[in-house]
């Protein structure tokens, strides 16, 4: 979602995400999530000729599960809110790191003519990597047979 504030002449790019219970500190520090929104800011600036300092970014997180006020797992009244907002850092250094990350990915995965590079990528099984892998239960294609 992109909004425009006429008085300050600034744009805000809002990335709406869903989460079971909201984002913890680990999710907020996930650079891949931050880089996605930072790159939206960069490309929006390039496409429409808007200075970067006139573009703000924000995550708007919708919680799928909200605890009741009398739930014993409720640690704070703020935990019961259905939405959560997070504004990641978006200065020049962070934006530069996002651009470097996407360019490194493109250079590693694609040839200069746009074709996919054929390469061998070593398996790196871990709780996080295997959790999202489509082959996590496919011992024939994975070969690791690791289940978390």
Q: Locations of the language-model features?
A:
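Non-catalytic protein-protein interaction segments used by genome-maintenance enzymes to assemble
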Residues: 1-37, 45
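Metal-dependent nuclease catalytic regions and adjoining charged, substrate-binding loops involved
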Residues: 42-148
């Amino acid at each position: 979602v992109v909004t425009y504030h006429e008085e300050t002449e600034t744009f805000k790019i809002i990335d709406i995400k869903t989460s079971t219970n909201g984002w913890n500190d680990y999710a907020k520090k996930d650079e891949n999530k931050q880089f996605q929104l930072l790159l939206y800011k960069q490309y929006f600036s390039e496409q429409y000729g808007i200075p970067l300092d006139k573009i703000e970014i924000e995550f708007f997180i919708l919680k799928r599960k909200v605890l009741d006020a009398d739930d014993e797992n409720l640690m704070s009244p703020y935990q019961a809110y259905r939405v959560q907002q997070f504004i990641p850092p978006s200065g020049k250094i962070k934006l530069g790191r996002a651009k470097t990350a996407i360019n490194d990915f493109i250079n590693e995965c694609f040839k200069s003519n746009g074709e996919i590079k054929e390469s061998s990528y070593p398996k790196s099984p871990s709780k996080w990597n295997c959790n999202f892998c489509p082959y996590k239960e496919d011992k024939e294609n994975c070969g690791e047979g690791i289940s978390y």
